[in-house]
Regions:
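Juxtamembrane transmembrane-helix termini in multi-pass membrane transport proteins
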Residues: 27-92, 151-170
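Selected transmembrane alpha-helices and immediately adjacent juxtamembrane segments
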Residues: 121-149, 155
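Short, Lys/Arg-enriched N-terminal segments with co-localized hydrophobic residues
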Residues: 11-27
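Membrane helix-loop-helix hairpins that form the core translocation module of multi-pass transporters
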Residues: 30, 60-130, 182-190, 196-202, ...
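Juxtamembrane boundary at the C-terminal end of a transmembrane helix
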Residues: 210-217
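Hydrophobic/aromatic residues within the transmembrane alpha-helices of Major Facilitator Superfamily
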Residues: 40, 44, 74-75, 109, ...
């Protein structure tokens, strides 16, 4: 009888542990996938993508530029993710869902505003740090206060998953920027920028509406 009870207790505990593990895995996947998609969309036509085109056209060395973008993004988004995770401990999930929804809708409107490179980023392009160093400096500066950095803060605060969000936002940045680096400015003028921006803006508004109603968030 005692042996049977112990077996049942172990079975119940095992099932609960399995369910908890599955839920945690689902949350990690959700944070990673949503972060990847959101940032990849936000990066379309962004000043950092323009910067990738400028650096690729000037230096014509894709590999050190790609590595520079990766390092700058990891450092910048790690800080943003840490801030977001900390903010997430201060407010309720309902408030964070609303904040994320507003962020998505705001990014949808923001993405319609054309981005240009400012003087500080242009100066960073002319540093004597080499291709890799110039890319790290320029990209890090360009990301400060950018919509993808703000998105990282909001996503980390919403999902409470630092590594999943930072990995996702970094992958999203690379998905958007690596093709731009490889192609350089060779085909940039042929892209229907306004159409692409419009589609991305609509998708962000849809994501914002989904977040408001708790669909998938």
């Amino acid at each position: 009888m005692i042996h049977s009870c112990r077996y049942r207790v172990r079975l119940v505990v095992g099932r609960r542990s399995f369910i908890t593990a599955r839920e945690n895995h689902h949350n990690v996947d959700q944070a990673f996938l949503i972060s990847t998609g959101a940032v990849a969309l936000a990066e379309i036509g962004d000043k950092t993508q323009l910067l990738s085109l400028v650096l690729a056209a000037r230096y014509r060395k894709p590999l050190p530029i790609i590595l520079g973008v990766l390092v700058a993004t990891l450092v910048n988004h790690a800080g943003a993710g840490a801030l977001g995770a900390w903010l997430g401990t201060l407010v309720t999930p309902a408030i964070m869902r609303w904040a994320l929804a507003v962020s998505f809708i705001g990014m949808g409107l923001w993405i319609l505003v054309p981005d240009t490179l400012d003087e500080d980023e242009a100066k960073a392009n002319r540093t004597r740090l080499g291709v890799f160093g110039a890319t790290v400096v320029a990209f890090f500066l360009a990301e400060m206060g950018d919509k993808t950095q703000i998105a990282t803060v909001a996503l980390a605060a919403r999902f409470h998953d630092f590594f999943g969000v930072v990995a996702g936002t970094t992958l999203g940045m690379m998905i958007a920027n690596v093709p731009a680096i490889i192609l350089g400015d060779r085909f940039a003028h042929r892209l229907p920028t306004k159409v692409v921006h419009g589609i991305a803006a609509v998708m962000f508004v849809v994501l914002g509406a989904m977040a408001l109603f708790g669909v998938g968030f």
